[in-house]
Amino acid sequence: LRWDILDAFAEAAAQADVPHTTDFNRGSNEGVGYFQVNQKNGWRWNTAKAFLRPTCYGRPNFELWTGAQVSRLLFETQPDGTRRCTGAEVWNGSEKVTVRATREVVLSAGAIGSPQILQLSGVGPSELLRQHGIEVVLDAPGVGANLQDHLQIRAVYKIAGAPTLNVMASSMIGKAKIGLEYVLKRSGPMSMAPSQLGAFTRSSPDREWPNLQYHVQPLSLDAFGDPLHSFPAFTASVCNLNPTSRGSVRIRSNRFEDAPAIAPNYLSTDEDRKVAAESLRVTRRIAQQPALAKYKPEEWKPGVQYQTDEDLARLAGDIATTIFHPVGTTKMGADNDPAAVLDSRLRVRGVQGLRVVDAGAMPTITSGNTNSPTLMMAEKAAGWIVEDNR
């Protein structure tokens, strides 16, 4: 599935000195082109389809629970005084049940869920745990700290003379056509990734490597979950790949049902605000290129009336949202790093029998999407688990 407006944006980016590329995984990701995606026969592909179903389904030693939530991990004191993770307490939807581990426990609840579970289990900043009446198993100040995310700044441009999803899905007939094409052919807008066209470039020429990533979409809306706009438009979503802002994930009570306090602290540093303003200027430069001229792009958000760095940084915060790449809250690190929760094999320092395998282990956010790096980390961890338990 290709869109004229996306092809024109790619050509405009090339005219603005962002080179064309057909492969973002060739070593240098700088350039503009169509993303490689996790998709097969019109369906999104995932780890369950690629790993669990062909390998684990039907095995007598594999059991998968859905609709369940870990309330806490269980620890026992060993004869030498160390603490070992021996299982988990799980809410299965009707009652709490205890699951015991004979070798080790692998926690993979993500960069938000894993620190929450660790803190509820007594592994985390001691003052936070005591505040909520939780016994301290391990004082680990790094648990829940160092939260990083890619903040996408969603610039919207009204256009004319090109089909967009806004127009195609604006009527019941249009929606029916889209649905019918997907049912019959597994193609069309319902088969596409949220963003098809991407680009990696620099916010300013003095940058050593690309520090911006674009996700360009043939649609627009006020916020995720809201209706599409009634006018034809595209969204040029740009994020700072290397943010310096750091946030946190901290429990608000000792109840597993209560969501933690998530403080991403977006745009909290001068550097991040500077890059935000620069990134919107890069977007404007691309939109002004000849390749897009015939579609008469009109900046709708943030609006051409905003020109100063201060205004652009402020407006960036108003039109931005997470791109769902939280990392870093259980980071791996060196032995002499007091904030390192995990060692180089993803084992939790200070206790035995427990690993964390998810994006929270990344000490610094990747310069691109986090999905594939997390899968690669999981594959490495699988090998380490086998080696360490021989």
Locate the predicted segments by residue.
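Conserved redox-cofactor binding core of oxidoreductases
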Residues: L1-C85, R154-G179
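Glycine-rich loop(s) and the adjacent beta-strand/alpha-helix scaffold that form part
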Residues: R72-G179, G188
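Soluble FAD-dependent oxygen oxidases
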Residues: T47, L64-G67, R72, C85, ...
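Structural detector for helix-capping/boundary residues
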Residues: A50, A68, R103-E104, T330, ...
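Stable alpha-helical elements in mature extracytoplasmic
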Residues: I5, F9, T47-F51, G113, ...
